[in-house]
């Protein structure tokens, strides 16, 4: 299934207050524009986000090179440089570890409103797990600044979960 946004760009940009806008992963608007219309089309999408949130609050997301995607990282790095935004390393993690794949698949099927069998085509060949620092460095080796930027963003967004007292299940990460 197609994902429908819960909030629109206008409402989010009006909220302001230090929101950070990631451009999205492989299925996000920037990558869709890049695949459909090339770098110029992707730049237009990036410009819309910069106009809405400001260049300091827009982060060009790069999930790392898998297969023949090295050139995509170069294009994204150049888009970030040219727009004055930052390239950030991400992994698109959906699960904490490979042992949680079955649970992650069930949650994805639920989100899609389909059975597990029907959702199989949407789960992708690369299941996404949290990666170690060494794995992230290997995945994003061509763009070490993206790793540094991701660490800075994570530090600025970090907070103590005990402050909101959620009842989360204990899990090993």
Residue ranges, per PLM feature:
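Phosphodiester-processing cores and adjacent nucleic acid-binding clamps
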Residues: 1-173
């Amino acid at each position: 299934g197609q994902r429908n946004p819960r909030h629109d760009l206008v409402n989010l940009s009006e909220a302001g207050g230090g929101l950070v806008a990631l451009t999205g992963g492989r299925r996000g608007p920037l990558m869709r524009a890049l695949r459909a219309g090339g770098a110029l089309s992707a730049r237009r999408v990036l410009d819309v986000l910069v106009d809405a949130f400001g260049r300091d609050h827009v982060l060009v997301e790069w999930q790392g090179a898998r297969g023949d995607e090295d050139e995509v990282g170069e294009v994204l790095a150049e888009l970030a440089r040219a727009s004055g935004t930052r390239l950030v390393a991400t992994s698109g993690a959906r699960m904490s570890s490979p042992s949680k794949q079955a649970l992650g698949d069930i949650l994805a099927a639920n989100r899609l409103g389909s059975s597990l069998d029907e959702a199989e085509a949407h789960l992708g060949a690369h299941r996404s797990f949290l990666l170690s620092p060494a794995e992230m460095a290997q995945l994003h080796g061509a763009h070490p600044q993206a790793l540094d930027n991701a660490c800075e963003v994570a530090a600025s967004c970090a907070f103590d979960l005990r402050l909101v007292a959620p009842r989360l299940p204990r899990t090993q990460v």
